[in-house]
Amino acid sequence: MSVQSTIRRKTAPDIRARKGGDPIVMLTSYHAHTASLVDRYCDAILVGDSLGNVMHGFETTVPVTLEMMILQGHAVMRGSQHALVVVDMPFGSYEASKEQAFHSAARILKETHCGAVKLEGGVRMAETIRFLTERGIPVMGHIGLTPQSINTLGSFRAQGREEGSWEPIEADAKAVAEAGAFSVVVEAVAEPLGRKITETIAIPTIGIGASAACDGQVLVLEDMLGLSPKPPKFVKRYGDLGPGIEAAIKGYAEEVRSRAFPGPEHVYGMKSKA
């Protein structure tokens, strides 16, 4: 006899059903502690490969490994109860073949217990998305600016801002939707294009630097908390935690050096004899 939790976690079909409804709220998290905070207010938590930048100081997401994603995905699952947890498939874990993608995605789901995976690419990845979804793996797509392709893009620049540049991105959105993805992240595209894609495809769009018309929004948690020194244009800072954290560390260092910490209230005395 198994013991089932009475708390119901959101699923990929729940997010899919939100098309055209209340906006979907999503943030990134890589730790159990932040996941528990994000979980209170968000519909979905993205364990993004942006952890390579945020946690490890990489310049791009390319060096991130499958093992890194699984480790942090498991942490986020332990820290959350309600939100759908989506784990990024890192560069090199799914592009070679749809079979490679299945084995990587299956590992992520089995070892983290998350509810879905996310992968980058539109038309070129449609066959893989279909292969995964037909085999029981919920997939969130990612089009527009695709950071894992930085070495071919050359820079992290917004997409679809020139005349005649919309068609490939629109084709990507359509391909991802028709392949069976339950939603798609639309990153750093011209606002009118983000709006048009949202109006055109049947699955929810989750914007990041796209349009307020998208079916939902996502940001990197550390960016919106003010912990990133140079966040992208599309980030709104809802907090300024950086200076506060620095002040706390400075205060701690000063008190340790002056022997003001630990004080009497922070140490243990001897037990009195009975």
Swiss-Prot record:
Its main location: cytoplasm. Coiled coil: none annotated. One of its GO terms (biological process) is pantothenate biosynthetic process. It is found in: Cytoplasm. The active site is at E187 (proton acceptor). Its EC number is 2.1.2.11. Its cofactor is Mg(2+). GO terms for cellular component: cytoplasm. Gene3D superfamilies: Phosphoenolpyruvate-binding domains (3.20.20.60). The keyword Cytoplasm applies. Mg(2+) binds at D49, D88, E120. Signal peptide: none annotated. Catalyzes the reversible reaction in which hydroxymethyl group from 5,10-methylenetetrahydrofolate is transferred onto alpha-ketoisovalerate to form ketopantoate. Belongs to the PanB family. This is 3-methyl-2-oxobutanoate hydroxymethyltransferase. It comes from Rhodopseudomonas palustris (strain TIE-1).
